[in-house]
Amino acid sequence: MLTAICYGTNPLFAMPMILAGIGTNSILFYRYIFASLIYGAFMKLVKKHSLRISLREFVALIFLALLFSLSSITLFASFRYIDVGVSCTLLFVYPSLVAVISAIFFHEKLDGSVILAICSSTLGVSLLSLTGESAGDAMSVRGILLALCSALLYALYIVGVKQMKPIQRLPNDKLNFYVMLFGLIVYVCNLRFCSDLQGLHTPLLWGCALLLAIIPTIISLETLTVAIKLIGSTRTSILGALEPLTAIIVGVAFFGEQLSWRICTGFLLVVSGVLLIIVRPRKNGVASQG
């Protein structure tokens, strides 16, 4: 629960920076660099882990970091066009996309529950796409496409973590650290080697940047690893439904976003589709361990 709630606070710390005129690449640069520094120090000083990696691991991590960073950019960019709760709910279709990608490229079977899940998620996305007074205008369409693009990129990242052999024995915390560290490359390039980096001129902005690196990034990633070990991946994934719910609550409570029947119904349909993916029977006839 803590993992999902922490990750769902992304908009809480990102939106004040967006409203202050800070660009998406600058926001994510601060998030990733603070997270990398804190995470690296934590691994080295507290966990006493070696940070050494092989050349094959380096190449794989660069590729994964690119996917992860682009997913972050598109998600945060979508906050500028549509409600944050809608953005995070659209992101939550990624388990369905993982199932489709795995079926197409790795010949995993699409059973009836997966097809039903995809239909449910698609209907939920359709309802969410019709929310708000400006539904259908260019701004809304752009935001929806950005959020869905973020979900696709994150799904590709998940598949990559699962399928890329060089990183199969890499500890989770080392994987997370290098994905964030190498992910900085995207923002450094987009900011023209930081010449376009916007400064943080108030304590509030510094606090938001630091908390963005700590709560929805480091704490979320660390508690996710612990949760999987304690209760298994299935229960952890089910509780992940609290992530878009948290984002919706943040949007309504802090940013005056409206909660309509379409948003509620779309949220339930998307989450239902995800739960069907998570708890569907495996090849041995039982749900995944957890």
Language model features by range: what are they?
Residues 1-30, 66, 70, 74, ...:
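Glycine-/small-residue-enriched transmembrane alpha-helix faces in small-molecule transporters
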Residues 8, 65, 69, 73, ...:
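Hydrophobic/small/kink-forming positions within alpha-helical transmembrane segments
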Residues 17, 27, 31, 78, ...:
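Hydrophobic/aromatic residues within transmembrane alpha-helices
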Residues 1-5, 19, 36-63, 76, ...:
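Membrane-interface interhelical linkers
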Residues 39, 62, 68, 110-132, ...:
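Hydrophobic transmembrane alpha-helices of multi-pass small-molecule transport proteins
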Residues 38, 94-119, 245-265:
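C-terminal transmembrane-helix exit sites in multi-pass transporters
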Residues 28, 32, 129-131, 205, ...:
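C-terminal-most transmembrane helix of multi-pass membrane proteins
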Residues 30, 87-93, 161-183, 217-253:
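Helix-helix packing/entry segments at the starts of transmembrane helices
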